[in-house]
Amino acid sequence: NAISDFMSPDRVVVGVESARAEKLMSKLYKPFLLNNFRVIFMDIPSAEMTKYAANSMLATRISFMNDIANLCEIVGADVNMVRSGIGSDTRIGRKFLYPGIGYGGSCFPKDVKALIKTAEQNGYSMRVLSAVEEVNEQQKSVLFEKLKKQFNGDLQGKTVALWGLAFKPETDDMREAPALVLIDKLLEAGCRVRAYDPAAVQECKRRIGEKIYYACDMYDAVLDADVLMLVTEWKEFRLPSWAVIKKTMAQQIVLDGRNIYDKKEMEELGFVYHCIGK
């Protein structure tokens, strides 16, 4: 989305060090001003801080919701209902309130770390962001912990299908991807891993080699699998043929890391189903 984001930005933040620089940059960004896009001028340190703080705020919302989701499971609440309830508050809004298995990519992890490091270098502690980072790292293992619980800790020889490798849909980017943490833990526990991703297979091979089986499609991934883990919410995973999958799997267990399936429907189809936060 780089081109569309550039041509239709939510806002443009420009750091300048003088009135002359602001005048020159205003001329450069004149097409954006004519289209009524927000162009905000400020001093350079504030512009730099704005960029890091914006991504860190979004990362904070994600980790907060993941923490709430984990508590919902403990006390018997439904995180989807909680999300709807708090998202309807106009002071909060609905964006970035979806629980899952942690954020990844090149922006959120990097910018959170950058603010924490900048604070340390200046004798200050970013306690909230340190907690955000800690929660996110723990959340990347939540599906593995559910798997251990399902099999009472004995995972040796289990075949696990992964749907999704990239950190988000519509990309092959695996930087800081939860799938990498999950694969490491599964292999260490003695599991066989069968993975499919519409775009990130080659990138995964580049990173970890042939340690796992790379399926040609989502149905190949679940062949003789004991468990299916939904890792990345690609559109093609939303409406699979569950009848085919049920016949193909060795055991009918689904761990949904993105909450894209309906628990009641999955159980009526005969699957053992676990998701995040309910």
Residue ranges and their predicted role:
Residues 1-278:
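Structural/interface elements that position substrates and couple domains in central-metabolism enzymes
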